[in-house]
Amino acid sequence: MSSLAFNYIVNLLSRREYSEFELRNKMQEKNFSEEEIDDALSRCQAKNWQSDRRFSENYLNSRVQKGYGVGRIRQELRQLKGVSSDIIDEVLMESEIDWYEMAENLLRKKFPNYNEQQTPKMKQKIWQYMLSHGFRSDEFADLIGQNQSEWD
């Protein structure tokens, strides 16, 4: 057991939460062996210093504050942070976020005059912005008086 590997993880975790995937990548960059990585991670997880579930909850809250929807958050957690789909599903199910209300608030903030600007170009801009922020069309299309079929 390498105390150097363990100390490295503890040092990282003392600053912020990390997913297991992120910690593994950081330790591999520092050329720790797989055995050292596994051992250090196991010790931290046993002490509840590292938890993908807790990381996902914190990440969800931070991304919601920045105006991102469920699709974008799910994708980032899975692809960029390496969190398992099961954990992501649990965290999203347990969250009490009203994605429709969030989409409406973001739409009002980013496009304050969206009701008055009903040009096709403006609708296209809103549509692209909302989709790129991870909102499903059913969460915002009726807010701009539009059906998805109008864009097909």
From Swiss-Prot:
Q: Spell out the InterPro entries in the cross-references.
A: RecX_HTH_1st, RecX_HTH_2nd, RecX_HTH_3rd, Regulatory_RecX, WH-like_DNA-bd_sf
Per the record, the GO terms for biological process are: regulation of DNA repair
Coiled-coil region(s) = none
Q: Which GO terms describe its cellular component?
A: cytoplasm
Keywords from the UniProt entry: Cytoplasm
Q: What is its main location?
A: cytoplasm
Q: Where in the cell is it found?
A: Cytoplasm
Q: Give the matching Gene3D superfamilies.
A: Winged helix-like DNA-binding domain superfamily/Winged helix DNA-binding domain
Q: Which family does it belong to?
A: Belongs to the RecX family.
Role description: Modulates RecA activity.
Q: What is this protein called?
A: Regulatory protein RecX
User: Which lineage?
Assistant: Bacteria, Pseudomonadati, Pseudomonadota, Gammaproteobacteria, Pasteurellales
